[in-house]
Swiss-Prot record:
Function: Plays a key role in hydrogen peroxide removal.
Domain of life of the native organism: Eukaryota
Name of this chain's protein: Putative L-ascorbate peroxidase 6
Gene name, Swiss-Prot/TrEMBL: APX6
CDD domains, alphabetized: plant_peroxidase_like
Cleavable signal peptide: none
PANTHER family: L-ASCORBATE PEROXIDASE 6-RELATED, THYLAKOID LUMENAL 29 KDA PROTEIN, CHLOROPLASTIC-RELATED
Species lineage: Eukaryota, Viridiplantae, Streptophyta, Embryophyta, Tracheophyta
Keyword Heme in annotation: yes
Recorded family membership: Belongs to the peroxidase family. Ascorbate peroxidase subfamily.
Length: 329
């Protein structure tokens, strides 16, 4: 096959999600000089094509679909394919090991321990910096447990270690994957949304730099700027803050994942003279209702729990993919 004829560039094999066994292959064929039949003369003419052909092949040998794209669109497509390949499960056994992880996690993570496990996710992934793509979800939290901001997380990691030992007996998984799935299960255990998590993250062999997590004392403007550096919008900041609905921060039932966090924020109980209510939430929680842009989303989520669940799910998936290094087969 010469360079003037259609040639195979690369074949990609994808698994649609971590629960599906459906696969498809795409062959990217370079532009070729194509012999066409001219309707006017009924003669064959040679025309140099500027388009690329994408042939999608199913497991059925007799089934395929061909799409045609311009060179410019092909550049965009190839870039998108490369990006998506990092967002899809890289391990061929992901569909088999994922339910095992869920099962073992649920054996050790009770509703009372869910908040600590979810906090583990934020403290591992929250070190991500968009400008240099440093930090992020990489299991480095295991080396950072003595830091002041991570006090109390050693217990949560020990809880997950019990589940990880069982999972590793079947198939070794990274701490980054284990923490990501555990956070999702913690939300679900407490009545929150079911959040799908793809597998294939690699662990870091060293701790992330210090001082990358947002301090609890930040103002609203400081929070927005901090989350912006990590690639998150104000809406995503407010949605992710809803994780404080479980735990001991004082936002309703500590074992129920719902939108009580936002309803209580609007009541501003910390302004009361009562010693108990004055301790509700962190300064960073209080800051959300002192900023017009944040307040708009606080009100929206207080009124619509389904919207909160939807936006939290999307933001969580983004969080546990932030800065991830993926296992390339």
């Amino acid at each position: 096959m010469t360079t003037t004829t259609a040639s195979l560039v690369k074949t990609f094999l994808f698994r649609c999600d971590s629960f599906s066994s459906f696969k498809f292959k795409c062959k990217f064929e370079s532009p070729a000089k194509t012999r066409l039949l001219s309707p006017a003369t009924e003669k064959h003419v040679v025309r140099s094509s500027r388009a690329w052909r994408i042939r999608c092949l199913s497991d059925d040998p007799g089934s395929s679909h061909v799409f045609v794209a311009s060179r410019r669109k092909m550049v965009v497509l190839l870039s998108t394919v490369q990006l998506l390949s990092h967002m899809l499960p890289q391990n061929g056994n992901a569909a088999e090991i994922y339910p095992v992880m869920q099962n073992e996690i649920r054996k050790v993570v009770t509703k009372g321990k869910a908040a600590g496990v979810l906090r583990l996710v934020f403290h591992d992934a929250g070190t991500f910096e968009l400008d240099d793509h440093s930090g992020g979800i990489n299991g480095s939290i295991a080396y950072e447990l003595e830091r002041p901001e991570n006090i109390g997380l050693k217990k949560s990691l020990k809880v997950l270690a019990k589940a990880k030992v069982k999972v590793d007996e079947i198939q070794p998984v990274s701490w980054a994957d284990m923490i990501s799935v555990a956070g999702s299960e913690a939300v679900s255990i407490c009545g929150g949304p079911t959040i799908p998590v793809v597998l294939g993250r690699l662990d870091s062999a060293q701790p992330d730099p210090e001082g990358k997590l947002p301090p609890e004392t930040l103002s609203a403007s400081g929070l927005k700027e901090c989350f912006k550096r990590k690639g998150f919008s104000t809406q995503e900041l407010v949605a992710l803050s809803g994780a404080h609905t479980i735990g001991s921060k004082g936002f309703g039932d500590p074992t129920v994942f719902d939108n009580a966090y936002y309803k209580i924020l609007l009541e501003k109980p910390w302004t009361s003279t009562s010693k108990m209510t004055s301790m509700v939430g962190l300064p960073s929680d209080h800051a959300l209702v002192q900023d017009d842009e944040c307040l708009r989303w606080v009100k929206r989520y207080a009124e619509d729990q389904d919207k909160f669940f939807e936006d939290f799910t999307n933001a969580y998936i983004k969080l546990v993919n932030s800065g991830a290094k993926w296992n390339m087969l």
